[in-house]
Amino acid sequence: MTSNKDKNKKANEILYAFSIIGIIPLMAILILRINDPYSQVLYYLYNKVAFLPSITSLHDPVMTTLMSNYNKTAPVMGILVFLCTYKTREIIKPVTRKLVVQSCFWGPVFYAILIYITLFYNLELTTAGGFFKLLSHNVITLFILYCSIYFTVLTMTYAILLMPLLVIKYFKGRQ
């Protein structure tokens, strides 16, 4: 019989694999942009999604619009990770009832804010605050930003879906 740590390790490996698979299209957009800034493929895709709300940079509107709109698929990938791992995830550390209640309240609140900003909000990085303005001038830093957003949304979606199951396991274990 496998231990809870082994089960969680396997679930984490699946999460990492899905994260890497999910970032491959972002790398493809970056490589296309670096090799051919006026790529017909990029401009064709850009024209298809330009009307959607996105986090963009005026220094590279085509690449950033495509990456931002691709990031809208992160919740779907989070759902797939959840469906592949929900049976194997276990609670390892002892948790208090207070922590469970706080997680059940603040987790969805934070997730709703994150989803609104990343999926439904128009944001121009060159006019944003100092840190984001700095990132908006270089395609590599923009790529890192969009990979970070993708991974954050994927992980948060997975965590929000997993939370009710862990709460049920928590209360069953206390009986």
From Swiss-Prot:
Record carries keyword Cell inner membrane: yes
Instruction: Please give an example of a GO cellular component term from this record.
Output: plasma membrane
* GO molecular function per UniProt: toxic substance binding
Here the disulfide bonds are none
Q: Which UniProt keywords apply?
A: Bacteriocin immunity, Cell inner membrane, Cell membrane, Membrane, Plasmid, Transmembrane, Transmembrane helix
> What membrane topology was assigned to this protein in its record?
Multi-pass membrane protein
* Location of this chain's protein in the cell: Cell inner membrane
> Could you confirm whether the keyword Manganese appears in this record?
no
Coarse class of the protein's main subcellular location = membrane
Q: What does this protein do?
A: This protein is able to protect a cell, which harbors the plasmid ColB encoding colicin B, against colicin B.
Name of the molecule in the record:
Colicin-B immunity protein
UniProt source species: Escherichia coli
